[in-house]
């Protein structure tokens, strides 16, 4: 009952979202050359919400009236802070131009034995790695994910086979989802998908899973999306010095913090490693952001090149969590070329730290004291003690986490476009808008009665060959109704008891708009030698698909094999009896009435009763 109430409330909130947001701030983010900064971050710390701009640089924030400090961030550019006051029902156009970050690099003595200044910083970050790996004791947040894949080049032929004309350059997959993600140590996840949208379909559910794109460089081995069998070595892994070289490219100031920009360089081209940059915050030695790349040289499968960009921000309790993740990829195979991206935005964090506040200062002071000589190559690892938080309170009930990892609202794919427009944090590009419009138009056409009737006229044509091989089906696609009969070899049989047997069966099925369905199967049987008539009927009803609930009632007087698994098929027995003069079929007359009920009560657990 609580679950139903929750989903009802969420749907009401979504439908009323135009009234909830009283003001809009929107604009475009560009660089000094007025080129769009795709997927730049926009963040309001006081509200714990944010967004990213789209591929064309446009962003949009829907907020209540008030005064806010808005941060505009893009890796490699100076963070810009804008204070904005908005009134109720006001729309403000705020275009932003970000300047390239000017990195400062202190003078260092260069000699044959000196190491790059990046190494002491990396050692400090490695020493704190486990602290930050186990830092979030539990959290909940909202996650918006958008995925897009497009073809840019289509070959004329693949392995001498002509490519169909309907396969052409353009978007081939576009999806959005809005979920609530919950986490508790150790590695307990539970996700509720509230809304889902797939271009060209109002029935499909998005494959987006927030828990599946967890990309955590505090782990020794990173393998988000299962990009290869081994995973990839983190640049902060305990043995990362075996795989990487490091170079300090400079430092910059942001909100009173000093951030180091460190280039990570693979020692061997074909190791499962990253290339790019990692940004580390001075004194706390946390990850500030990442700008990484992996390619086929690193052993990545399915795609050619993958770019990973992350931004972190401080949440309640001092815990830093990712607020945005972007996976931008390029692919090429058999002459096809394409690209795409998945962007994940995290908002409304509720976090609880594993450690009391004084734990951080003690550990950080200890590390700083151990490294008074910057070139030292030995740093004591922090011994992570998984201490309880200040209180034993928790966000979740004891039974909240179970075998159910992903729950999908029954109406997740029914969210209307107007609602999506009000809750979507990343504006759609003109290309994406056109894709939704075109594919929705095609879908509406394909779901229309004239179109379905035209298909039925072709598919319902009677064919004697099919009647002998697979039977015959007559369908009303628009009404989602079908009538089917068995193939001839199942209707006409022969056995030594009944002689020639006539055994017709009619299967009637109907599916409704809410995906419930029923099936009615009347069947009769007449043996010419025994001169006996038998009959039975079976009725099944599935009111919904989420829990695979199924009601079934059957009964009648019919011929049944002694082995209930029916190991001998009618056509096989008829052939043996008529051609080999051998009969292996053993049957008896069965009169019965049966009712059954089945339902999944938990993930992997099904309840069934029958009488």
Describe the role of every protein-language-model region:
Residues 23-37:
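Structural motif
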Residues 44-46, 71-83:
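A short, solvent-exposed loop/turn motif at the edges and junctions
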Residues 47-58:
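Short, acidic Ser/Thr/Gly-rich low-complexity loop/linker segments typical of extracellular
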Residues 85-113:
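Extracellular beta-sheet/turn segments enriched in Thr/Pro/Gly and aliphatic residues
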Residues 102, 107-259, 265-274, 334-493, ...:
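Structured extracytoplasmic
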Residues 110, 291-296, 483-494, 505, ...:
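Transmembrane beta-strand segments that form the barrel wall of outer-membrane beta-barrel proteins
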Residues 303-304, 331-340, 544-599:
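Outer-membrane beta-barrel translocator/channel fold
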Residues 512-519, 545-551, 603-607:
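Repeated loop/turn-to-beta-strand initiation elements of outer-membrane beta-barrel proteins
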């Amino acid at each position: 009952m609580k679950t139903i109430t929750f989903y009802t409330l969420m749907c009401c909130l979504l439908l009323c979202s135009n009234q909830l947001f009283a003001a809009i701030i929107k604009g475009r983010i560009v660089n000094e050359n007025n080129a769009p900064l795709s997927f730049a971050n926009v963040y309001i710390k006081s509200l714990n919400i944010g967004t990213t701009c789209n591929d064309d640089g446009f962003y949009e924030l829907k907020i209540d009236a008030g005064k806010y400090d808005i941060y505009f961030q893009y890796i490699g550019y100076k963070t810009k802070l804008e204070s904005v006051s908005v009134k109720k029902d006001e729309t403000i156009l705020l275009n932003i131009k970000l300047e390239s970050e000017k990195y400062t690099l202190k003078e260092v003595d260069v000699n044959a034995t000196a190491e790059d200044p990046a190494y002491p910083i990396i050692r400090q970050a490695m020493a704190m790695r486990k602290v930050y790996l186990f830092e979030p004791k539990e959290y909940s947040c909202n996650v918006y994910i958008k995925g897009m894949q497009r073809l840019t080049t289509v070959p004329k032929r693949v392995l001498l086979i002509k490519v169909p004309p309907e396969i052409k350059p353009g978007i081939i997959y576009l999806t959005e989802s809005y979920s609530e993600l919950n986490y508790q140590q150790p590695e307990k996840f539970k996700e509720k998908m509230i809304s889902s949208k797939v271009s060209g379909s109002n029935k499909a559910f998005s494959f987006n899973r927030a828990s599946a794109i967890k990309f955590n460089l505090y782990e020794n081995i990173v393998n988000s999306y299962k990009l290869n069998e081994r995973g990839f070595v983190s640049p902060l892994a305990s043995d990362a010095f075996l795989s990487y070289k490091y170079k300090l490219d400079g430092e910059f100031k942001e909100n009173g913090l000093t951030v180091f920009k460190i280039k990570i360089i693979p020692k061997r081209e074909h190791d499962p490693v990253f290339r790019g940059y990692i940004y580390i915050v001075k004194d706390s030695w946390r990850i500030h952001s990442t700008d990484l790349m992996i390619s086929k040289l690193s052993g990545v499968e399915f795609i050619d090149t993958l770019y990973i960009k992350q931004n972190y921000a401080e949440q309640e309790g001092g815990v830093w969590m990712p607020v945005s993740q972007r996976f931008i990829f390029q692919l090429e195979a058999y002459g096809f070329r394409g690209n795409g991206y998945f962007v994940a935005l995290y908002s409304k964090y509720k976090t609880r730290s594993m450690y009391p506040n004084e734990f951080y200062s003690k550990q950080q002071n200890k590390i700083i004291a151990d490294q008074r000589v910057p070139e030292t190559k030995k740093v004591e690892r922090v011994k992570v003690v998984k201490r309880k938080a200040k209180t034993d309170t928790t966000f979740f009930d004891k039974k909240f986490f179970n075998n159910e990892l992903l729950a999908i609202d029954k109406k997740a794919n029914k969210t209307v476009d107007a609602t999506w427009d009000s809750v979507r944090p990343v504006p759609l590009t003109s290309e994406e808008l056109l894709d939704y419009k075109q594919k929705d138009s095609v879908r509406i056409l394909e779901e229309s009665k004239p179109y379905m009737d035209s298909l039925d006229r072709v598919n319902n044509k009677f064919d004697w060959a099919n009647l002998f091989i697979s039977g015959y089906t007559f369908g009303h696609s628009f009404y989602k109704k079908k009538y089917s009969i068995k193939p001839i070899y199942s209707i006409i049989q022969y056995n030594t008891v009944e002689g020639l047997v006539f055994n017709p069966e009619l299967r009637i099925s109907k599916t409704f708009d809410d995906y419930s369905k029923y099936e009615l199967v009347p069947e009769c049987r007449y043996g010419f030698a025994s001169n006996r008539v038998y009959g039975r009927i079976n009725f099944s009803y599935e009111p919904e698909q989420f829990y695979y609930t199924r009601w079934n009632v059957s009964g009648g007087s019919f011929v049944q094999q002694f082995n209930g698994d029916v190991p001998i098929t009618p056509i096989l027995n008829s052939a043996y009896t008529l051609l080999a003069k051998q009969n292996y079929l053993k049957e008896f007359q069965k009169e019965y009435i049966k009712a059954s009920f089945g339902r999944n009560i938990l993930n992997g657990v099904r309840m069934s009763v029958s009488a």
